[in-house]
């Protein structure tokens, strides 16, 4: 289930009068009406198929949940990985799972509000890839965040390396499904997407902005140029890797989350000044991978049906002025 910001605001019973009118009828009908009116149709996932006796939900520890999630990923569990438990205990019982891109303070509070005590986050908790904290001990923001997690007893497990190593890459599959481009995915060359026919760069950008809910993006290129081959570099991909792929594949467009401006950006600019056709679109790290974590929530829910799994967007941190 996808929880947007409005789902976690106060006043959880905005249609109280309407529900009260229906409460005099069949008890089960009333419960279904309550669930669909207040929480949306996703609430029905937690209702029993027959009768009123709610079956006892199967209990899982954090470790058991993690083991289920990574079970079918090739090579898992990895010996060296950033996918570690960064908060909480492996032994604590899971009451609910939230998937997100960045485990921000807002996401933590929203998870607590819906009764979830495990956050599966794609990116780092403490502002560096390895989540090293020695250098942050004197930082008041770090201290506040750590204390908040302790108070709420929330476990945070990072789901980065394993999700990318899934076949297909979990982020890529979620992104391409969101764009309606998954039928064009090529397993033999997963980073190169070829559309059925060329489209203008403008039409592709408009399509991405709508489906990824991106208000603004940065672009090196000509909006009128035709594009058919797209190199996928969601998130943050090493510039040398992108430049090497550009040399070999000569894609019409590089679609990336973020990149150092003096590297890939300048290589694309100089290439265009020479007469090359490759354009570059920079979506932002969070927004370029968020649909992949929304997909992760659906994927994990199928594997762990007894525990509610929700997606909460961490959101774009930038204000465009």
What is the predicted role of each segment?
Residues 3, 11-321:
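Hydrophobic structural segments
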């Amino acid at each position: 289930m996808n929880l947007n910001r409005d789902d976690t605001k106060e006043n959880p019973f905005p249609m109280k009068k309407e529900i009260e009118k229906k409460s005099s009828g069949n008890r089960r009908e009333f419960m279904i009406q309550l669930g669909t009116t207040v929480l949306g149709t996703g609430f029905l996932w937690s209702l029993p198929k027959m009768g009123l006796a709610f079956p006892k939900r199967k209990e899982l520890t954090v470790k058991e949940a993690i083991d289920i999630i990574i079970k079918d990923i090739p090579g898992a569990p990895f010996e060296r990985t950033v996918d570690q438990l960064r908060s909480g205990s492996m032994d604590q019982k899971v009451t609910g799972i939230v998937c997100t891109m960045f485990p921000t303070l807002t996401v933590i509070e929203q998870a607590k509000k819906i009764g979830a005590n495990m956050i599966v986050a794609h990116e780092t908790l403490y502002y560096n890839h390895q989540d090293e904290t020695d250098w942050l001990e004197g930082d008041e923001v770090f201290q506040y965040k750590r204390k908040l997690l302790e108070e709420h007893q929330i476990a945070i497990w990072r789901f980065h390396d394993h999700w990318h190593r899934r076949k297909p890459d979990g982020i890529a599959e979620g992104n391409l499904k969101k764009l309606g481009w998954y039928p064009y995915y090529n397993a033999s060359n997963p980073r190169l997407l070829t559309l059925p026919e060329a489209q203008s760069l403008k039409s592709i950008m408009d399509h991405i902005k709508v489906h990824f809910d991106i208000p603004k993006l940065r672009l090196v290129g000509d909006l009128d140029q035709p594009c058919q081959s797209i190199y996928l570099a969601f998130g943050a991909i090493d510039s040398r890797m992108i430049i090497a792929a550009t040399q070999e594949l000569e894609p019409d467009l590089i679609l990336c989350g973020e990149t150092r401006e003096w590297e890939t950006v300048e290589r694309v600019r100089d290439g265009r000044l020479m007469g090359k056709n490759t354009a570059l679109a920079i979506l932002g790290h969070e927004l370029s991978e968020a649909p992949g974590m929304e997909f992760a929530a659906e994927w994990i829910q199928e594997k762990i049906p007894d525990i509610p799994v929700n997606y909460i967007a961490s959101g774009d941190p930038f204000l465009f002025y």
